[in-house]
A protein has these predicted regions:
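Short beta->alpha connector loops at strand-helix junctions that form conserved
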Residues: 12-17
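PLP-dependent aminotransferase class I/II
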Residues: 94-171, 175
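Alpha-helical elements of Rossmann-like donor-binding domains used by nucleotide-donor carbohydrate transfer enzymes
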Residues: 11, 24, 28, 53-56, ...
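Active-site pre-lysine segment of PLP-dependent enzymes
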Residues: 4, 20-32, 44-67, 71-104
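Substrate-binding/gating loop at the entrance of the active-site cleft, primarily
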Residues: 1-8, 131-132
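Structural motif
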Residues: 35-39, 68, 114-116
């Protein structure tokens, strides 16, 4: 939707073994490319691209191209191999990091998330966003979630228990 709204042409790069193919994504970048999206962890495959893979990819991305890291599921993928996407912003790269309160904080119905970006990008986003895109209740809930680590940990524990339950039930059905 973002690409179409901006009058751009979307280029889809096929997954390789259920993972983002950063090599193919780098090859797909042309002089017309303005934006690249990396969903990490990927949805729906839950696979990640590692810090090393992202570093190699970023070395091939021209400085003029904005790299958007969609990290909606970041709380489910912490570990030593997971890239620090915020570091690219600190290095002065054109990067945007998107995160949400929908998943780990269980606030999906409130439709609240955030972007971390440089001032120029934020100014651009403010020009195209809806004027009242996050209601007051969602803002209060998001702020409360930021201050309540135990809530996030409990939500993650419950989600993990649900995953194990589903896996066990599918196994018992022979699926």
């Amino acid at each position: 939707m973002i690409v179409q709204a901006a009058g751009g042409i979307r280029v889809v790069v096929t997954l390789k073994d259920h993972r983002l193919d950063l090599e193919a994504m780098a090859r797909a970048i042309t002089p017309m490319t303005k934006l690249v999206f990396i969903a990490n962890p990927n949805n729906p495959t839950a696979t990640i691209v590692t810090a090393k893979e992202v570093e190699e990819f970023m070395a091939r991305v021209p400085d003029r191209v904005i790299v958007v890291f969609d990290e909606a599921y970041i709380e489910f993928a912490q570990g030593p191999d997971f890239p620090d996407s915020l570091a690219y912003m600190k290095q002065g790269r054109k990067a945007v990091v998107l995160r949400t309160f929908s998943k780990a904080a269980s606030l999906a119905g409130l439709r609240v998330g955030y972007a971390v970006a440089d001032a120029d990008c934020v100014a651009l986003l403010n020009r195209i966003r809806q004027p009242f895109n996050v209601n007051s209740l969602a803002q209060v809930a998001a702020l409360a979630a930021l201050e309540d680590d135990s809530h996030i940990l409990e939500c993650l524990r419950m989600i993990e228990a649900g995953r194990h339950f589903l896996s066990d039930e599918f196994t018992s059905l022979g699926l």
